[in-house]
Amino acid sequence: MPVFTAKAGHEATLHEALLGLQSLSRKDTGCLEYTVFSDDQRPGTFVLIEGWVRHTDLEAHNEEVHVKEFVNGVQPLLAVPFSVTPLTPLV
């Protein structure tokens, strides 16, 4: 679960970049879910919920050009480095 917090004044740009990443990533092999949410309690903060068929699909996704370009391009827009918390569904 990646969390992104925009620098003041960069919220809209980060929002658009995340929507672009969402659109491309949903086409990646093994993608079950890839949805960006805005945090209602922290303006400018976005949370990404993603699900993959296999862990190897996630690993392949992370090596995709669109992901690497996003990660490199978004750095100047962030107030703090983005964090990722791996989640496992309870069965």
Segments from the language model and where they lie:
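An amphipathic, aromatic/His-enriched active-site/gating alpha helix that lines ligand/cofactor pockets
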Residues: 20-32, 51-84
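Hydrophobic/anchoring residues in structured secondary elements
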Residues: 36, 83-89
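Short beta-strand micro-motifs enriched in acidic
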Residues: 37-41
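Short, conserved charged micro-motifs
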Residues: 9-14
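Active-site-flanking beta-strand signature of metal-NTP-handling nucleotidyl enzymes
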Residues: 1-4
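Short amphipathic alpha-helical segment that frequently serves as the phosphate-/nucleotide-binding helix
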Residues: 15-19
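Conserved catalytic motifs of the protein kinase core domain
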Residues: 44-45
